[in-house]
Amino acid sequence: MSDEKKPEAETSESLQKREEKLAETLASEPAAQGEAEDAAAAGPDVAALEAEISDLRNRLLRAAADMENNRKRAEREKQDAQRYAAANFARDMLEVSDNLRRAIATLKEDERAEAAESVKAMIEGVEMTDRQLVTIFERHGIREITPQPGERFDPNLHEAMFEVPGTDQPAGTVVHVLGAGYMIGDRLLRAARVGVAKADDGAAKGGKVDTIA
């Protein structure tokens, strides 16, 4: 009789186990679904964060580039300020050099040769002073530009003080040099003062000289 009841007990146990497995499966499905939903919801957030990080990185790079450009510009402005700070003073000193040269130029060679020793010493002192001025100018980046007769007038470097007719030269040719010009760095400190050839009436050589830079 015990043998007849044994299959029934096994059948009950089997059904119970199946019910337990089914309950576990049903219980795990909402959790898995929730995890999937959480992952799907987190996806857009990750993409947004990556986009924000990329934007911040680009802003940082642009800011660094702007800072470097500002530093270079400030350095250039500092160098220009140092180089050209004394431009007005140097321009005034050029007049002193001009006056020294005019004083020397008024003496003819024979007059200088016949002058007393004291006068010769004074002339030599004036010449030495002018040479010292030129040396000081060069030390501070100031260089002389002296056009030669026959050169073409350059409105960027020369100042035409007058025109000379009847020179048989093309209009705009430098025929007289009244004073040297000077550059400071790459800028014009003072234009060279010149006289230029004037076009003859009806002449085909050249035309009216352009005296405006």
Swiss-Prot record:
Question: Where do the record's region annotations for Disordered lie?
Answer: 1-43
* InterPro entries linked: GrpE, GrpE_coiled_coil, GrpE_head
Work out whether the entry's keyword set contains Chaperone.
yes
Q: State any single GO MF term.
A: protein homodimerization activity
Keyword check for Chaperone: yes
Coiled-coil stretches are: none
Biased amino acid composition, Basic and acidic residues: 1-23
Q: Name one GO biological process term.
A: protein folding
The UniProt keyword set, sorted, is: Chaperone, Cytoplasm, Stress response
Intracellular or extracellular location(s): Cytoplasm
- Name the source's superkingdom: Bacteria
Q: Where is the composition biased (Low complexity)?
A: 29-43
Chief localisation class:
cytoplasm
* Gene3D superfamilies per UniProt: 3.90.20.20, Head domain of nucleotide exchange factor GrpE
Provide GO CC annotations from the record: cytoplasm
Q: Which family does it belong to?
A: Belongs to the GrpE family.
Subunit and partners: Homodimer.
Q: Outline what the protein does.
A: Participates actively in the response to hyperosmotic and heat shock by preventing the aggregation of stress-denatured proteins, in association with DnaK and GrpE. It is the nucleotide exchange factor for DnaK and may function as a thermosensor. Unfolded proteins bind initially to DnaJ; upon interaction with the DnaJ-bound protein, DnaK hydrolyzes its bound ATP, resulting in the formation of a stable complex. GrpE releases ADP from DnaK; ATP binding to DnaK triggers the release of the substrate protein, thus completing the reaction cycle.
NCBIfam families cross-referenced by the UniProt entry: PRK14141.1 (NF010739)
Under what name is this protein listed? Protein GrpE
Q: What is the lineage of its organism?
A: Bacteria, Pseudomonadati, Pseudomonadota, Alphaproteobacteria, Hyphomicrobiales
